[in-house]
Amino acid sequence: MKISSRRLALRWWLAATISLGWLLAVGVAAAGPTGPSKYGMQPMTPAQAQAVRPAFVEVADIPALPRVLLIGDSISVGYTLAVRAQLAGRANVHRPSENCGSTGYGLERLETWLGAGPWAVIHFNFGLHDLKYLDAQGKYVAPEQGQQLVPVGEYEANLRKLVQRMQQTGAKIIFATTTPIPAGSAGRVEGSEQLYNAAAGRVMRAMKVAVDDLHAHALARQGTIQRPQNVHFTPAGSEELAGLVTQSILSELTP
């Protein structure tokens, strides 16, 4: 059957369009996540991440040792290197090469962070980014000028989903309570972590997850180890938190 030149041209156009679409899709997948999350975080390549923070450098496993995964925001980034040093020769301590942000971002990224495993222990926290207030441009603002990123009810529901997935790995799970918010912290309300820790406590009790109460320790030592008007800690403060994290991990690794 003879095909008209017009129909032949249409077939060529359709084939070219489909091929181009496939190539673009493959290219985007190969490139990985490049755009910011709706939760205000933006994944980096490993090279970019490692240039920003020494804690983001990937570690080589010692085969005979158990593998531990730390998941958390900048507070956990601050104690990662100390935990690695304290567990040297006893565990391979890994963490995602990024700030893990809020529970919403965690749901987007958890599969990537878990990777192929296996994990003996997963020590994690979410909270400080959930309870912050942002304006339409993503800037930290007072509560009356913006919206809370993840309201506490959504936070609690997100935690249940995150814990359920982590438990599927077979790892022992430890939740670290969210550390104190001092007066004057940008985009956050002093003491609001208490409401979020209460919600997290309900989830962890129901799902039988161990709790590392970093909040209680940090609150008792707040004037000494935490920066003023800032959720972050001094180097000595991060070292103290690392000691608590290390002990909680060892308690789960010990038969």
Predicted features and spans:
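Active-site metal-binding loops of divalent metal-dependent hydrolases
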Residues: D73-S74, L128
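Short beta->alpha junction loops
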Residues: R95-G101
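N-terminal secretory targeting modules
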Residues: M1-L69, S76-V77, L81-N92, G115-P118, ...
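Active-site beta-strand/loop signature of hydrolases that rely on acidic residues for catalysis
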Residues: I71-G72, I122
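Alpha-helical cap/lid subdomain in secreted, periplasmic
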Residues: T34, I62, Q86-N92, Y105-P255
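Short hydrophobic segments within beta-strands
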Residues: L70-I71, A176
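Short beta->alpha connector loops
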Residues: S74-S76, C100
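N-terminal post-signal-peptidase region of extra-cytosolic proteins
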Residues: R53-F56, G101-L110
